[in-house]
Amino acid sequence: MIRPDLNERILSLRKLRLAQCRTRTRRTIERRNGVRLEINGSWLVEFCSNDYLGLAQHFEIIAALQDAAARDGIGATASHLICGHHAIHKALEYELAEWLGYPRALLFGNGFTANLAVQQALLTKENDICVQDRLNHASLIDATRLAGCRLRRYPHLDVDGAAHQLKNAPEGAAMLATDGIFSMDGDIAPLRALSLVARTQQALMYVDDAHGIGVTGPQGSGCVAAAWLSVEEVPLQLVTLSKALGGYGAALLGSATLIQHLAETARPYIYTTALPPAQAAAALTAIRIARRDEWRRQRLQELVERFRENSRRHGLEIMDSETPIQPLQCGDETTTMAMSAALEREGFLVNAIRPPTVPEGKSRLRVTLSALHTTEQIDTLVQALARSRDALATEAAPVQV
């Protein structure tokens, strides 16, 4: 048997992506000023970042990062279990636990790593099972596959589907995992109903609230708190420090026993250098500002409502979302890419989301809003969206003879 050549495989896959127009290109940001970005010498208003509360360039957070870097250096120098766990890490974990109402928190470099850690450490047997929403983030899906346990997926937001999957797999330990806010659709999981299913089926309920933290709930405490669920009902959740909080990193929240088990057994935690202390200091300050500045969430919600109202008035096919993630359904990839390019010509950066990130035929423009956007920017964007849609429809219309 001839062993496959990896270089040939790579070239073949690249040709396939080219034929399908599914190559990916990184855009270099030369400068940033709030929601304005400079790319190739041109300034664009971006509607595609996750800086929901507008904290990424907040002067207090920058000052906290600079002070910590001057004091502790630019890196942790080791994993948490060796000599990388600094006082600022401890303070950040305490603040997170107090804010979200959990006994303990555990810091990670990013949400993807944290999701890998959870399932690798908890679902250790082949007959264990993780039941997930079909539209969960890729890191949750990949985590189950890498853990080596069984993966079962239920239709999006389908509580009965989740219950059915758990009932059909009574053997082995079980986890029911869901996003809080879904990153590509912007809708919110039915957490209260899912938590009841998890308790009934003796499954551990795990919520990845990467896009909910800071945005919803009391003091921005996220989707779990917004649903008035207790630690007993959602024993484990993940939050990121890189979206509404504007920085970098992630944390797991759970009981003291659960968090200690993860710290002692989760390989992605044990064998990874700790989050830089300066980033931890920035996140700590960001949390305090997010908790304090209720006006940011109020402003953000006003902009969401304005965008949706204007979009409906212009007949735009927006999806059902009340969060800062506002997808515009375009259907085919060609139309989506053309609309994204047309918006850029008008001074807006809105990314086209295509398969495999979303299902075939579900390509979309993923508009994300920030508390820093102005009402004028919202209104002008909607007008540009309507113009680009109409222009493409005119081009596609058959010529009358």
Swiss-Prot record:
The keyword Metal-binding does not apply. The modification N6-(pyridoxal phosphate)lysine is found at residue 243. Pathway: Cofactor biosynthesis; biotin biosynthesis. Its cofactor is pyridoxal 5'-phosphate. The keyword Transferase applies. Substrate binds at residues 24, 137, 357. Pyridoxal 5'-phosphate binds at residues 111-112, 183, 211, 240. Catalyzes the decarboxylative condensation of pimeloyl-[acyl-carrier protein] and L-alanine to produce 8-amino-7-oxononanoate (AON), [acyl-carrier protein], and carbon dioxide. NCBIfam families: bioF. Belongs to the class-II pyridoxal-phosphate-dependent aminotransferase family. BioF subfamily. This is 8-amino-7-oxononanoate synthase. It comes from Xylella fastidiosa (strain 9a5c). The lineage of its organism: Bacteria, Pseudomonadati, Pseudomonadota, Gammaproteobacteria, Lysobacterales. The gene is bioF.
